[in-house]
Amino acid sequence: MAKQTLGSLLSSGFDLKGKRVLVRADFNVPLDPQGNITDDTRIRASLPTIQALAQAGAKVILTSHLGRPIQKDKATGAIQIAREGNSLAPVAVRLAQLLGQPVAFAPDCIGPEAEAVVSSLENGQVALLENVRFHPEEEANDPEFARKLASLADLFVNDAFGSAHRAHASTAGVTAYLQPAVAGYLVEKELQFLSGAIENPQRPLAAIIGGSKVSTKIGVIERLLEKVDKLLLGGGMIFTFYQAQGIPTGKSLVETDKLDLARSLMEKAKARGVELLLPVDVVVADRFDKDANAQTVSIHAIPEDWMGLDIGPESVKAFQAALQGCKTVVWNGPMGVFEFDRFAAGTEAIARTLADLTQAGAITIIGGGDSVAAVEKVGLADKMTHISTGGGASLELLEGKELPGIAALSEA
């Protein structure tokens, strides 16, 4: 079902002036030991929603998690909250700089301190509440905690796509008390690309799936086989497919309990007329190390004591040829161990190919996780049509699953 969005709410003439709007954002940003934000991408991604609400005269109340502050004592089971290094205070400072207006910071997300900050807001002003995960009730989706959080506001906007696959109090629980509950601009964009591009694609539609294990991508591959024209596989998972065909893989990573599954996926692709491409050559190493000895070999000539850590140059050429003329390309997962420069060439070549395709008019979608890091490493993030901000959420949406944080929103 289609969900209400902030865009549709504003265009319908809904008056937000003076309304207290609780916005669940994703400010889970990396901090250095001094508490400085090392990457503000997620904060920038939330700006359109915040600015639209402020311009409409709303009182904007932002909430988010940061890190995993809850630590359980293994021996006693006692819960401790690690506040050090997990406070959203640095985010309030950065947000104020980006918005060009003050951002009031509440030292808690519920209770008298939060209430005082919210009640001091004028129309168009912005406040940020402290980390919701400082309360164990957040991840337990506790109704009473959700009610307290919701009591600060009149309506709810979910703009935290990266947390949409979790049924937590601040992503799903609050919608029981706040209506309308709508998708912010970022969430709307993610749904448009990750769902829309696969349900109603411009064809040919190709998907590139990488990563080390087949087991983590089974759901995605199975769903994509029903939708795509071409499926290109890379990363460590390819060795399970080779071994399923009786090709020796040396010391490469193989999930021996997934050999039958790999065979059935290949058969499914054939039956559906999907062009399934596996690499024809690989870069192998004598050990898993950035300084390992490396050589490029055919997949039929992997030495017994070596392991494959990247796709080879012939595979890159074959993949590039297969992608030519594709109108939509979805990419999730690297082609090799791109953290080691020696085994990053395959991933970087695919990133450059997608950037070229985008320039030629194709829709390119980087579906979250490591492939985003890879594209950023090569400096091509701005050359793609859409870069997903989610990790697990992107994967689950590509699998066709309903995300709790989206399911809880008001119907359009």
UniProtKB/Swiss-Prot annotation:
One of its GO terms (cellular component) is cytosol. It holds the Pfam family PGK. Keywords: ATP-binding, Cytoplasm, Glycolysis, Kinase, Nucleotide-binding, Transferase. Belongs to the phosphoglycerate kinase family. It is found in: Cytoplasm. Transmembrane segments: none annotated. Monomer. Its EC number is 2.7.2.3. GO terms for biological process: gluconeogenesis; glycolytic process. Substrate binds at D26, F27, N28, R42, H65, L66, G67, R68, R133, R166. ATP binds at K217, G308, E339, G368, G369, D370, S371. GO terms for molecular function: ADP binding; ATP binding; phosphoglycerate kinase activity. This is Phosphoglycerate kinase. It catalyses: (2R)-3-phosphoglycerate + ATP = (2R)-3-phospho-glyceroyl phosphate + ADP. Pathway: Carbohydrate degradation; glycolysis; pyruvate from D-glyceraldehyde 3-phosphate: step 2/5.
